[in-house]
């Protein structure tokens, strides 16, 4: 373990939150951090590796072997806790909601287990575990308070998640998350807009509207056009430069949403819409309430209204019963759709889902072969689509931590309006994350673009000011924020993908 300077004011306790899974969990972890800081804890320095006084695991139940990963990480902390009796370990998130009765049995050194519906209880549960000297397991079966009413420690100074709903009313057969996060519950529009306006007042210039099934917003109040109205309302907020959303369901993707995207200047020309399969037979088995023609029809309408839109998707390969003909239908749909990028997953059983007990589970070697064919096809399409960007002039929002080789190549990185990742030559003039630069694209790779010429223009922004202020004011009590561009699944070189049951949370 590296040597960490843990010097803090006497009596001040540090915390670390480890996040696994989807965007919902990332945003929930911001809330967990806010709750702990509100209770007097201080964030541990980056790289503390379990050296904090409180370590919180915010877990995912979608990824294969999520259980093994959690217990492996918990096991590595057991010796540290033996040496430091005052240390506390908490486990929350979807896996905690699912395995509430087994976590403390398998890892008796865990102090707190909490679920997806009661994250606001974490500080109280930690204190109760300390006083009573026994593990506290508290799982709520329904939402106690809308999470966005809780304190939040934002990870980025210039971009932010804004939750508009929680839960999901869909019943996809591969997905366990609706059972863990509950039925859909929408926030009041006024509360959402008030949060966005407050964020913009703090310097944020990009927001991502977040929901398990984001474009179903309004379903519990009976307004089928509530989401498109919300997009248009975002367009009226001064200082808000970029609006994104994730993830929509094709069933609820209506013409009024497409019109709002096209007619609201700060709604970015980008759509991440999970297809999951191109086979009507498989889509029916998945209990997805659309078919290939419907999905491709939505894409056609989006491109007619927004010609330069970048469209990305999620696809599951090897769903139970998928034949070679079914897989060829997926390949056909990918050729027709010409996605900017596809996040492709190999199906694996997830206990508790209907698909796990379906007949005709596909052999691993068949799934792997199909996966490789699909990835190769999409790589070719991604590269072809990116080549069309060469010669275009783009406005990029400068990002922090997006380019792994920026230091060695003397480049910076940013996101185009359509969320493509662009590496550009570092200008003589200082630019900060959150600032906007204008560049000309000179080269295309499958997962990124290059702008190797001089930067054409630099626009310093309030978002850049906010990043600089936070950067300067960081102290030992407030470690440097990650500053990642929060938003949709990114268009860029993907991380190595583990076998999984579905995309993201699996219910979009």
Curated annotation (Swiss-Prot):
Cofactor dependency: [4Fe-4S] cluster
GO molecular function, one term: 4 iron, 4 sulfur cluster binding
Domain TRAM as annotated: residue spans: 387-455
PROSITE patterns, per the entry: MTTASE_N, MTTASE_RADICAL, RADICAL_SAM, TRAM
Keywords: 4Fe-4S, Cytoplasm, Iron, Iron-sulfur, Metal-binding, S-adenosyl-L-methionine, Transferase, tRNA processing
Binding site for [4Fe-4S] cluster 2: 168, 172, 175
Keyword Iron: yes
InterPro entries per UniProt: Elp3/MiaA/NifB-like_rSAM, Methylthiotransferase, Methylthiotransferase_CS, Methylthiotransferase_N, Methylthiotransferase_N_sf, MiaB_methiolase, rSAM, rSAM_horseshoe
Any single GO CC term annotated in Swiss-Prot or TrEMBL for this entry: cytosol
Catalytic activity from the UniProt record: N(6)-dimethylallyladenosine(37) in tRNA + (sulfur carrier)-SH + AH2 + 2 S-adenosyl-L-methionine = 2-methylsulfanyl-N(6)-dimethylallyladenosine(37) in tRNA + (sulfur carrier)-H + 5'-deoxyadenosine + L-methionine + A + S-adenosyl-L-homocysteine + 2 H(+)
Domain spans labelled MTTase N-terminal: 13-131
Entry EC number(s): 2.8.4.3
Residues binding [4Fe-4S] cluster 1: 22, 60, 94
UniProt domain Radical SAM core: residue ranges: 154-385
Functional summary from the UniProt entry: Catalyzes the methylthiolation of N6-(dimethylallyl)adenosine (i(6)A), leading to the formation of 2-methylthio-N6-(dimethylallyl)adenosine (ms(2)i(6)A) at position 37 in tRNAs that read codons beginning with uridine.
Quaternary data: Monomer.
Family affiliation: Belongs to the methylthiotransferase family. MiaB subfamily.
Protein name as it appears in the record: tRNA-2-methylthio-N(6)-dimethylallyladenosine synthase
Organism: Streptomyces avermitilis (strain ATCC 31267 / DSM 46492 / JCM 5070 / NBRC 14893 / NCIMB 12804 / NRRL 8165 / MA-4680)
Upper taxonomic lineage: Bacteria, Bacillati, Actinomycetota, Actinomycetes, Kitasatosporales
């Amino acid at each position: 373990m590296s040597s960490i300077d843990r010097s803090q004011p006497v009596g001040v306790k540090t915390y670390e939150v480890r996040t696994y899974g989807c965007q919902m969990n990332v945003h929930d972890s911001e809330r967990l951090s806010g709750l702990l800081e509100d209770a007097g804890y201080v964030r541990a320095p980056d790289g503390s590796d379990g050296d904090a006084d409180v370590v919180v695991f915010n877990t995912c139940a979608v990824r294969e072997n999520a259980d093994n990963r959690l217990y492996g990480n918990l096991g590595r902390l057991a010796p540290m806790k033996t040496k430091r009796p005052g240390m506390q370990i908490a486990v929350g998130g979807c896996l905690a909601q699912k395995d509430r009765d087994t976590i403390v049995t398998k890892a008796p050194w865990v102090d707190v287990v909490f679920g997806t519906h009661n994250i606001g209880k974490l500080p109280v549960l930690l204190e109760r575990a300390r006083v009573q000297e026994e593990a506290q397991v508290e799982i709520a079966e329904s939402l106690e308070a809308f999470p966005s009413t809780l304190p939040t420690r934002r990870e980025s100074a210039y971009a932010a998640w804004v939750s508009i709903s929680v839960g999901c009313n869909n019943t996809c057969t591969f997905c366990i998350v609706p059972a863990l996060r509950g039925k859909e519950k929408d926030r009041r529009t006024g509360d959402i807009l008030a949060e966005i306006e407050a964020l913009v007042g703090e310097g944020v210039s990009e927001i991502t509207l977040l929901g398990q099934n984001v474009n179903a917003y309004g379903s519990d109040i009976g307004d089928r056009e509530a989401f498109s109205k919300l997009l248009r309302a975002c367009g009226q907020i001064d200082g808000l430069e970029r609006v994104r959303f994730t993830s929509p369901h094709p069933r609820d993707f209506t013409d009024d949403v497409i019109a709002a995207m096209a007619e609201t200047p700060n709604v970015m020309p980008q759509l991440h819409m999970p297809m999951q399969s191109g086979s009507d037979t498989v889509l029916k088995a998945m209990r997805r309430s659309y078919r290939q023609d419907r999905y491709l029809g939505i894409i056609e309408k989006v491109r007619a209204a927004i010609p330069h839109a970048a469209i990305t998707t999620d696809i599951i390969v090897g769903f139970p019963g998928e034949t070679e003909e079914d897989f060829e239908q997926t390949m056909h749909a990918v050729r027709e759709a010409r996605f900017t990028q596809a996040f492709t997953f190999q199906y694996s059983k997830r206990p508790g889902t209907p698909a796990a007990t379906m007949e005709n589970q596909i052999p691993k070697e068949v799934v792997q072969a199909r996966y490789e064919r699909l990835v190769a096809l999409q790589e070719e399409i991604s590269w072809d689509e990116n080549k069309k960007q060469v010669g275009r002039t783009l406005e990029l929002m400068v990002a922090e931590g997006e380019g792994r080789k920026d230091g060695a190549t003397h480049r910076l990185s940013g996101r185009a309006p359509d969320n493509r990742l662009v590496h550009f030559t570092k200008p003589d003039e200082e630019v900060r994350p959150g600032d906007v630069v204008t560049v000309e694209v000179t080269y295309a790779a499958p997962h990124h673009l290059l702008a190797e010429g001089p930067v054409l223009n630099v626009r310093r922004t309030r978002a850049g000011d906010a990043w600089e202020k936070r950067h300067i004011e960081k102290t030992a009590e407030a470690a440097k924020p990650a500053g990642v561009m929060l938003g949709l699944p990114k268009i860029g070189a993907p991380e190595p993908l583990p076998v999984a049951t579905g995309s993201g949370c699996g219910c979009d």
